[in-house]
Amino acid sequence: MTRHLIFAAVLLVCLFVCWNAVGAQDARSAFSSEETAQDQHVMEERIFINPAGNREKNACLENCRSSPNCKNYEFCSK
């Protein structure tokens, strides 16, 4: 009888671990697609507001350099 209880407990733990792994993967993919959508929106906004002029690009680079969250200047060069 105790073997059956141990087996059931191990099975429940395995199911719980697998369920959490699938949930975490879904959360990561949802966050990644949300982040990509936000990046795309920022890029579209930059292109729309700053249509390829030198002054606008320089202002974009200065804003990006002064922002602690800016990781690269890629969107400024478009």
Curated annotation (Swiss-Prot):
Record localization: Secreted
GO molecular function annotations of the record: toxin activity
Description of post-translational modifications: Contains 2 disulfide bonds.
A GO-annotated cellular component: extracellular region
Tissue: Expressed by the venom gland.
Keyword Ribonucleoprotein annotated: no
Superkingdom classification of source: Eukaryota
Key words, A-Z: Cleavage on pair of basic residues, Disulfide bond, Secreted, Signal, Toxin
Signal peptide start and end residues: 1-24
Propeptide: 25-28
Family: Belongs to the scoloptoxin-04 family.
Protein name (database record): U-scoloptoxin(04)-Er1c
Organism, scientific name: Ethmostigmus rubripes (Giant centipede)
